[in-house]
Swiss-Prot record:
One of its GO terms (cellular component) is extracellular region. Glycans are attached at N36, N51, N74, N152, N171, N260, N359, N493. Residues 1-25 form the signal peptide. It is found in: Secreted. One of its GO terms (molecular function) is alpha-L-arabinofuranosidase activity. The keyword Signal applies. Its EC number is 3.2.1.55. GO terms for biological process: arabinan catabolic process; arabinose metabolic process; L-arabinose metabolic process. The gene is abfA. This is Alpha-L-arabinofuranosidase A.
Amino acid sequence: MVAFSALSGVSALSLLLCLVQHAHGVSLKVSTQGGNSSSPILYGFMFEDINHSGDGGIYGQLLQNPGLQGTTPNLTAWAAVGDATIAIDGDSPLTSAIPSTIKLDVADDATGAVGLTNEGYWGIPVDGSEFQSSFWIKGDYSGDITVRLVGNYTGTEYGSATITHTSTADNFTQASVKFPTTKAPDGNVLYELTVDGSVAAGSSLNFGYLTLFGETYKSRENGLKPQLANVLADMKGSFLRFPGGNNLEGNSAENRWKWNETIGDLWDRPGREGTWTYYNTDGLGLHEYFYWCEDLGLVPVLGVWDGFALESGGNTPITGDALTPYIDDVLNELEYILGDTSTTYGAWRAANGQEEPWNLTMVEIGNEDMLGGGCESYAERFTAFYDAIHAAYPDLILIASTSEADCLPESMPEGSWVDYHDYSTPDGLVGQFNYFDNLDRSVPYFIGEYSRWEIDWPNMKGSVSEAVFMIGFERNSDVVKMAAYAPLLQLVNSTQWTPDLIGYTQSPDDIFLSTSYYVQEMFSRNRGDTIKEVTSDSDFGPLYWVASSAGDSYYVKLANYGSETQDLTVSIPGTSTGKLTVLADNDPDAYNSDTQTLVTPSESTVQASNGTFTFSLPAWAVAVLAAN
């Protein structure tokens, strides 16, 4: 859990106010009457496998390159142990999806332990939970097989198990082990699988699709890492958009994310070359995304491929009759998700372990089709997919992948939404504060991706600018229905995009919560169902605000995008006490990272006098007053 430091009485931040310059006081009066309804699912998550956020990130399988997947398989992350060598064997496939396995050639005079190691994704996090490993083996062998987790540089053993297993040269057989572990101090841990060299001497053994899991979130099979899932749960988001993003599109039609190759047993998933420079195992597949939504209480927002791949692949959008097989593929996917067991694809889902249909209400057609040559044909492509999906599933909310009018049909179909993305500078985000004030209320908005960009780690200036942007769309959350910061996760050792919301390494305790994370958490955890009118004697800037209510509770969100302290009076008739949460630093460049945590929120209890709260907001600050 993310713990805020609790302060009673006067906030520690207020003790510094005499040292900094104050602006004139700002008075805010929150109406307790009327207001506009606010979307109940406003804050949530956008996920795609970028920065090893899936494989090597939130997905719980810990071995890198577990099945030698890909058109050009390699031995990345694997090495031999003892008097033996390893090689790729394309003549002993495990399945049609896993055509290559690891061949272990044992020396004629071998003794002791021989086998193979895997270094994980820049390490393996051993957290002290029970671990389990599975693998396939082929070759004439009858004897002990040992799995160990051992320090890469220290040789310290953090857990092990030995089983007796018999295999033959005719077929692959699967073996699995479970074992307790002790917590490792860092991620410098190797997975080691060995056999008895004296028994295997002079022979060859093949190993296929090896896996390693620690404890998973809510003990879900093939599930999520609890360390990262817990941090997301703390945010209390409402939805999950998946599987992308650029990673949905692929670099070509053939390389797109294919739903039916991400289901079933892991060794029946071929994986794919992701669009962010590394291969995706697709162990985190369609089922796993829906279980993620179930376990964190999130509304699923499914992205489907719409005939357009990334421009970097030199692709021309697919249009006309050539779209038909791709539309059919989406309809098959939706039947798999929503169909009962009397349908072909619903029965397939049940055979894969999910008897009941999932609860899917939202589908986004494509990703960022305003970019890279997709705009001109998107109206045609969106309409083709919309018409087919709406005819089969009229209750689904269908979302266009852009809000740019030039890329959309002249008249959007009734009930459809649009998706608005904004990566910008801090001043650029602040400049968008009132963008949503005058929108056509007949077309709901999904802000599918936004953040400050062009910096390594979120800093206070950027995070405050994001808060200003968020206040702007929350004020208009009758029409802005959902919004998600992006990207969400970042393995510090292998990063393709910065900044990101949450960083981590493979050390069990290494999770780095950015200043932007705390802004997202503060805003998401303090939500009303009605946006209230606020009157003031001051204009917006550098102080920005929005107020909402839920029953007798009121939430006032504030952002100070400036270098002067702001003195405030906030009047909410009928309230008497409140909790003030403040994230602030006088240095606009202050940031949290893998080497420092400089900025965290503080909490204080504040009392009202006749319904009026009086306090000061430091420079470069984001605050939430929760009053009742």
